[in-house]
Amino acid sequence: MAITKEDILNAVAEMSVMDVCDLVKMMEDKFGVSAAAATVAVAAGPVAGPAEAAEEKTEFDVVLVDAGSNKIAAIKAVRGATGLGLKEAKDAVEGTPFTVKEAASKEEAEALKKQLEEAGAKVELK
């Protein structure tokens, strides 16, 4: 009777970690391969995935991180962007970080970021 893959898997599952490491080394020597090379190749695939996903992102949150030295200009910019009242905009600017706009398109987020940065504020797109 031949040994099945499942029999081998069950035998490996019952081994200690040290025994499995020894088995891997023996297989590397016997077949002239390296388990590390396979691991690197597998790890390289997922690394490229998130980078591509970040490029494809279509909605951004515009977050005011710091009002900068000219708070009045930052308050005016926040009011113009959000339609908040003077007190609400002042509280938002003083209570950074503050999400100015959620789920904005890339173009809208970039324009809003530029407007806030021209007022002296520090802005992040998330």
From Swiss-Prot:
Name of the molecule in the record: Large ribosomal subunit protein bL12
Similarity comment text for this entry: Belongs to the bacterial ribosomal protein bL12 family.
HAMAP family given in the database record: Ribosomal_bL12 (MF_00368)
Pfam families according to UniProt: Ribosomal_L12, Ribosomal_L12_N
Gene3D superfamilies, sorted: 3.30.1390.10, Single helix bin
Its biological purpose: Forms part of the ribosomal stalk which helps the ribosome interact with GTP-bound translation factors. Is thus essential for accurate translation.
Subunit-level organization: Homodimer. Part of the ribosomal stalk of the 50S ribosomal subunit. Forms a multimeric L10(L12)X complex, where L10 forms an elongated spine to which 2 to 4 L12 dimers bind in a sequential fashion. Binds GTP-bound translation factors.
Domain of life where this protein originates: Bacteria
InterPro entries: Ribosomal_bL12, Ribosomal_bL12_C, Ribosomal_bL12_C/ClpS-like, Ribosomal_bL12_oligo, Ribosomal_bL12_oligo_N_sf
Gene Ontology BP annotations: translation
GO molecular function, one term: mRNA binding
GO cellular component: cytosolic large ribosomal subunit
Keyword vocabulary terms for this entry: Ribonucleoprotein, Ribosomal protein
Gene: rplL
